[in-house]
Amino acid sequence: MPRTAAAVLAFAGLCLCSVPMMAQFNGLLPSGNVYGGFSYAQLTNVVVQQSYKGWNASFEALPFVRLPRLGLVIDGSGFYRRGETQYNAMGGPRFSTNIGKWRPFVHAMAGIRHLDSSGMVYQPLVIDAGGGVDYKLWFKNFSWRLQGDYMHSKYASAVQNDYRTSTGIVWRF
């Protein structure tokens, strides 16, 4: 019986102490969003520019209390065509603002591209400049995103100027 009473008192004490501890973190945890959607791109596969379909996903953290419109974003995408796959992993800053239900944004990112074309593998650096808009949906914390990007890379002694459009769902936290 004394062990049960001690366990109950310890649990009650832990619960009572956790409420003030949660107040300490209020406002310190970064806010942000997670995005996932469908993507269409005009990409150069070594020499020829072709159409690709695939996916795009990103995670944005808004860690700066004094700069609430500036976020840090990590972006990943994959594009597919018969005999070819292309993946991008990028990161960089994003600037956004809220205008009613709309949230326009611009970003600049850099990262790496992995292109597998008929057994030949290339992994050049890629630079991305783009932007878009989120429209707040009637669901709490959800938005719909339209996004466009220009991606620049160089491999196989040629310069690639690629374009990507994406659309999908955003969850804000």
Predicted regions mapped to residue ranges:
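Extracytoplasmic loops and strand-loop junctions of Gram-negative outer membrane beta-barrel proteins
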Residues: 39-43, 113-115, 150-152
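Gram-negative (and chloroplast) outer-membrane scaffold detector with strong preference
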Residues: 58-130, 134-135, 144
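Cleavable N-terminal export/targeting peptides
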Residues: 1-29
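Solvent-exposed loop/turn segments connecting transmembrane beta-strands
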Residues: 44-53, 79-87, 117-123, 154-162
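Short glycine/proline- and aromatic-enriched beta-strand/turn motifs that initiate or cap beta-hairpins
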Residues: 22-66, 72, 76-78, 166, ...
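Predominantly the C-terminal beta-signal and adjacent terminal strand-loop region
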Residues: 136-173
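Transmembrane beta-barrel architecture of outer-membrane proteins
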Residues: 31-33, 52-56, 86-90, 126-128, ...
